[in-house]
Each structure stands twice: as C-alpha cells, then as structure tokens.
C-alpha cells in the first residue's frame, strides 16, 4: 500500500513550481503523515495516519 492516510485517504498532491520567468516544473505537496500503531480489527498495526486525523481524535494510538 502506498503512503496514504489510513483513515482519511489523504495523500500527496501534485502541481507546478513556477519560477519568475513562469517556467513550470512538476512538484509535490506531501500530506503530514505519521507512522503510528493503532488497533485494526482488534489487533495493533502500524499504519500511516495524517496529523489532522490524529489531532481531531479520529484514531487513538496503542
């Protein structure tokens, strides 16, 4: 599985970096993902979770 939030599905988004001459280069905006242990089906598992999901209390650490 890729680097994506286990709870919200947030992942990196793409776009362009623009110089002063308006040249376009591809770039990525990475989500703030943290690897944490949570209970999945009653068992502890290490998954990627976004910091926003952790702060809002959507998951609890084990």
UniProtKB/Swiss-Prot annotation:
Name the domain of life this protein comes from. Answer: Bacteria
Keyword ATP-binding attached? no
Which key words tag this protein in UniProt?
Ribonucleoprotein, Ribosomal protein
| Acyltransferase is among the record's keywords | no
Question: Which processes are annotated in GO (biological process)?
Answer: translation
Q: Which residues form a coiled coil?
A: none
Gene Ontology cellular-component terms listed: ribonucleoprotein complex; ribosome
GO function terms (MF aspect): structural constituent of ribosome
Provide the family line: Belongs to the bacterial ribosomal protein bL28 family.
Q: What is this protein called?
A: Large ribosomal subunit protein bL28
Give the classification, highest ranks: Bacteria, Bacillati, Bacillota, Bacilli, Bacillales
């Amino acid at each position: 599985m890729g680097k994506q939030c286990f709870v919200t599905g947030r992942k990196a988004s793409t776009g362009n970096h623009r110089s002063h001459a308006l040249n376009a280069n591809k770039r990525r905006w990475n989500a703030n993902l943290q690897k944490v242990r949570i209970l999945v089906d009653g068992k502890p598992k290490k998954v990627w979770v976004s910091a926003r999901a952790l702060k809002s209390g959507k998951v609890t650490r084990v």
